[in-house]
Amino acid sequence: MNDHGKIREIAEAYTAAWNSGSPQAVAEFYATDGRIAINRGEPWRGRAGIAEMAAGFFSDVPDLTLVCDKVHSAGNHVAYLWTFTGTHSKTKKPLSISGWEEWDLDAELKVKASRGWYDANEYARQAGDA
């Protein structure tokens, strides 16, 4: 369906959206009916839901900086591996968390479904059990 170069461009732009601090910029990478579930939790649905999810991360880590570590793709399926750093807003402790998202892209190369993963126990440990 897609060439790896185009997928890499999308991943770089998605990373820039997270680094902009704008929940709406993050949400624009999703289909209007897209969704994301993190660590098998309840999914956020639609762009408004995606923006709400991103806003939660920005609230917890206002100086969040995201790096795309690697991208793998096969057809319309993408693995986006990332690391974010920043300072937890409540405890003021530094964070460095790695994880990944598994994307299913639609025909317009928007994320239809994302399954996100990171070690929540490690996050809690670094944040000081905030």
Per-segment meaning from a language model:
Residues A11-T15:
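N-terminal hydrophobic signal/anchor transmembrane helix of membrane proteins
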Residues F29, D33-R45, G56-D60:
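A short gly/proline-enriched turn/hairpin at secondary-structure junctions
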